[in-house]
Amino acid sequence: MNATEMENVSIRRLDSSDPRFAQALREVLAFEAGEDEAIDRAVAQILADVKDRGDAAVLEYTQRFDRVEAASMGALEISQSELEAALEDLEPKRRAALEAAAARVRAYHEKQKIECGSHSWEYTEADGTMLGQKVTPLDRVGIYVPGGKAAYPSSVLMNAIPARVAGVKEIIMVVPTPGGVRNELVLAAAQIAGVDRVFTIGGAQAVGALAYGTATLPQVDKIVGPGNAYVAAAKRRVFGTVGIDMIAGPSEILVICDGTTDPDWVAMDLFSQAEHDELAQSILLCPDADYIAQVEASIQRQLDSMPRREVIAASISGRGALIKVRDMEEACEIANAIAPEHLEISAENPRQWSEKIRHAGAIFLGRYTSESLGDYCAGPNHVLPTSRTARFSSPLGVYDFQKRSSLIEVSEGGAQMLGQIAAELAYGEGLQAHARSAEYRFKRS
């Protein structure tokens, strides 16, 4: 065996007809993100320091963790001219791809804004009372973008563009630059997406600066974007002071296949999430045992050609599974129990089966719809709920950068009717001032 070759990777094989299947599936899905106490203590100290000392603390932590020394926070801000230069210097083909992806993401979220209740509304009752809802964008949003090897320009587009479409007045991006090395593609993406300010800071100190504000970096209303364990712990701690998008877990893909798709395609789709990190999860549900064997053979055959094969192998063997189901109906039932981040329905009639899906972050229909298209350029957002949170949460969208205020304008006639109802209920709750506040308006009319 060559030094570059790997032994066959071990993959769980489950069968839904096995009496122990439910327990085996729970074991596959088991993942406790947990909170590392050492990380949490360190993050708490960093956040308190940033809240207390502002810019000075951020500068110190940036020097300590990223090995970037700066005399002031201003020196860590990237100018608009530098962002423009990053875009201009891109290789034409790469720039065209980035701009095409941005255009599609923007078009999708513009449509989402129209269709998802993003406009104010009101109605008037017979007595002249007006009721409604006012929709307003957030004033200022912070976007966290990972730096170093995990720098993803696609994440810039997916986080910044819906904020811009929502009407957010100011978008501030933070991105660490370990050793002072900047990712020009990330900066170019910021320029395309319409980011207003970019600071080369990261970690818990960047989250603290966004959440509390400093003399240089103003406080934001919400922080979105992925990060490492320190960033996740910091976001969890500042929630309430500011809003956050979510605490994301490892990437997930679940493929439901009827056995009609090229097994090499399905194997590579499973790899597409497994290559993210060792804790990523890739699962296949299929009623055809022979087809499952073909996919497994393809996994073994293709693995050696993958640059990130060690990561893929660890992910597939540690958290992956190939599951034989009775039929496609049962596959959909199991998919709803798993509530995956990404769900591919690779079948002859994907729409038929998608009707049975209730819980998934994103649903990819048909054999030509690879999950990777959704990651980069299809248009819908790739920031999706993980760890079964798709049961109760949604992809990042325009709605995450808006808030809603109730509108109530009661007419004189309305005060007579509503006041009596409110007063009666208030007396029942023992709240005299509530009752009298309503009574004054109908007794004096």
Swiss-Prot record:
Question: Which GO terms of type biological process are on file?
Answer: L-histidine biosynthetic process
Q: How is the cofactor bound?
A: Binds 1 zinc ion per subunit.
The reactions it catalyses are:
L-histidinol + 2 NAD(+) + H2O = L-histidine + 2 NADH + 3 H(+)
The residues that the entry says bind NAD(+) are: 144, 205, 228
* Active-site residues annotated for this sequence: 341-342
Quote the pathway field: Amino-acid biosynthesis; L-histidine biosynthesis; L-histidine from 5-phospho-alpha-D-ribose 1-diphosphate: step 9/9
| A cellular component annotation (GO) from this entry | cytosol
Q: Which residues bind Zn(2+)?
A: 273, 276, 375, 434
Q: Indicate which residues the UniProt annotation says bind substrate.
A: 251, 273, 276, 342, 375, 429, 434
- Which co-factor is required? Zn(2+)
Per its UniProt record, what Pfam families does this chain match? Histidinol_dh
Task: Write the record's keywords in alphabetical order, separated by commas.
Answer: Amino-acid biosynthesis, Histidine biosynthesis, Metal-binding, NAD, Oxidoreductase, Zinc
What are the EC numbers? 1.1.1.23
**Gene3D superfamilies given for it?**
1.20.5.1300, Nitrogenase molybdenum iron protein domain
GO MF terms on file? histidinol dehydrogenase activity; NAD binding; zinc ion binding
Which PROSITE patterns does the record associate with it?
HISOL_DEHYDROGENASE (PS00611)
Per the entry, what this protein does is: Catalyzes the sequential NAD-dependent oxidations of L-histidinol to L-histidinaldehyde and then to L-histidine.
Family, as annotated = Belongs to the histidinol dehydrogenase family.
Record-linked HAMAP family: HisD (MF_01024)
Per its UniProt record, what PANTHER family does this chain match? Answer: HISTIDINE BIOSYNTHESIS TRIFUNCTIONAL PROTEIN, HISTIDINOL DEHYDROGENASE HDH
What is this protein identified as? Histidinol dehydrogenase
Name the source organism. Cupriavidus pinatubonensis (strain JMP 134 / LMG 1197)
List the lineage, top down. Bacteria, Pseudomonadati, Pseudomonadota, Betaproteobacteria, Burkholderiales
* Gene designation per UniProt: hisD
